A protein has these predicted regions:
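Hydrophobic, aromatic-enriched alpha-helical segments typical of multi-pass transmembrane helices
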Residues: 1-211
Length: 211
């Protein structure tokens, strides 16, 4: 398997894994941090499985974009590709950090010595903040990546869709609160990102990207 096809598979499979987990995400219906903690604690085994699969997907698409931007560094708009690659390097440890904090949340719920609500809720909130930071760096990388691909004469619709997804991630980083509007914007941004990333993966797999 060529590097380009391996990259393509990561971009296709990566977004699909978290998407499959959303229907069974433990705290999807929670309206507060306390409710989220309770939902996770009600089934710690399911929560562990869901978080693990989802974060494998997160790591997959970040690795896919990392490999893609690495391959784009030579040639037209190579400087932008290099910066995009650096943004992805910065986002990778944040995904690991978020996963670790979510596992720590589950462990804290199960441990009577550290199961104080304030501790558990703080862990969960910090894990979410790490996810926001990931979105910022990944969003910048996607906007730059879209620019590079467009400079390589890749389909204009695809690059525009990818750029919009990146902008959505950047904007979502600066939105705060638990309002329905904020949640809706975040959900729509994630769906848009997932579909655009899969589309990039399909183009790469079919050798439609000029690398």
């Amino acid at each position: 398997m060529t590097l380009q096809r391996f990259t393509a598979l990561l971009l296709i499979i990566g977004p699909i894994l978290p998407f499959l987990m959303f229907p069974i995400w433990p705290s999807s219906d929670a309206e507060s941090t306390a409710e989220s903690v309770k939902a996770i604690g009600d089934n710690t085994t399911l929560s562990t499985i869901v978080f693990t699969v989802a974060h494998l997907g997160f790591a997959g698409f970040v690795t896919g974009y990392f490999l893609l931007t690495k391959q784009l560094q030579n040639g037209v708009a190579g400087g932008a590709a290099t910066v995009a690659n650096a943004m992805l390097i910065l986002s990778a440890p944040l995904i690991v950090l978020q996963f670790g904090l979510r596992l720590a949340t589950i462990s804290s719920i199960s441990d009577p010595q550290i199961s104080e609500p304030i501790i558990v809720e703080t862990l969960l909130v910090v894990s979410g903040t790490a996810g926001d930071a990931t979105g910022l760096f990944a969003g910048i990388a996607m906007v730059l990546g879209a620019y590079v691909l467009r400079q390589r004469n890749v389909n204009a619709v695809l690059t525009t869709v990818l750029a919009i997804a990146g902008i959505g991630f950047i904007v979502d980083t600066f939105l705060s609160g638990n309002s329905d509007l904020v949640d809706t914007i975040g959900f729509v941004t994630w769906i848009w990102f997932s579909l655009s990333t899969i589309a990039v993966g399909v183009f790469a797999y079919r050798n439609k990207l000029t690398i």
